[in-house]
From Swiss-Prot:
It holds the Pfam family Ribosomal_L20. The gene is rpl20. The lineage of its organism: Eukaryota, Viridiplantae, Streptophyta, Embryophyta, Tracheophyta. Gene3D superfamilies: 6.10.160.10, Ribosomal protein L20 (1.10.1900.20). Binds directly to 23S ribosomal RNA and is necessary for the in vitro assembly process of the 50S ribosomal subunit. It is not involved in the protein synthesizing functions of that subunit. NCBIfam families: rplT_bact (TIGR01032). Belongs to the bacterial ribosomal protein bL20 family. The keyword Metal-binding does not apply. Disulfide bonds: none annotated. This is Large ribosomal subunit protein bL20c. PANTHER family: 39S RIBOSOMAL PROTEIN L20 (PTHR10986). GO terms for cellular component: chloroplast; plastid; ribonucleoprotein complex; ribosome.
């Protein structure tokens, strides 16, 4: 039985997968079946970790704000600060508040004074 040369579509698909696996080692770089498995696994991990990264950074920002509010005695804790911010309609997200709390605590005092003055 003669060998039938296949078209270029499968080669293109495998070359694309191989380009994703260019930094892998051993059989994960050389064998097509292993390449497809490992690339699929890498994509799943990267998607999962992108979602997890958002969660982890939010937790980090909250813990930084909480620590700064307790150390500098701005409020009793994080939840009271956030509650008063929402109550007074001051729109500051947790990332910005965490940067302010770490880099310039004096601005944290001014924010808390704004909240208390509006009361």
């Amino acid at each position: 039985m003669t060998r039938v040369p296949r078209g270029y579509i499968a080669r293109r698909r495998r070359a694309k997968m191989r380009s994703f696996a260019s930094n892998f080692r051993g059989a994960h770089l050389r064998l097509n079946r292993m390449i497809t498995q490992q690339v699929r696994r890498a994509f799943v991990s990267s998607h999962r970790d992108r979602v997890r990264q958002k969660r982890d950074f939010r937790r980090l920002w909250i813990s930084r704000i909480n620590a700064a509010t307790r150390i500098h005695k701005v409020f009793d804790n994080y939840s009271k600060l956030i509650h008063n911010l929402y109550k007074k309609e001051l729109i500051l997200n947790r990332k910005i508040l965490a940067q302010v709390a770490v880099l310039n605590p004096n601005n944290l005092y001014t924010i808390s004074n704004k909240i208390k003055i509006i009361n």
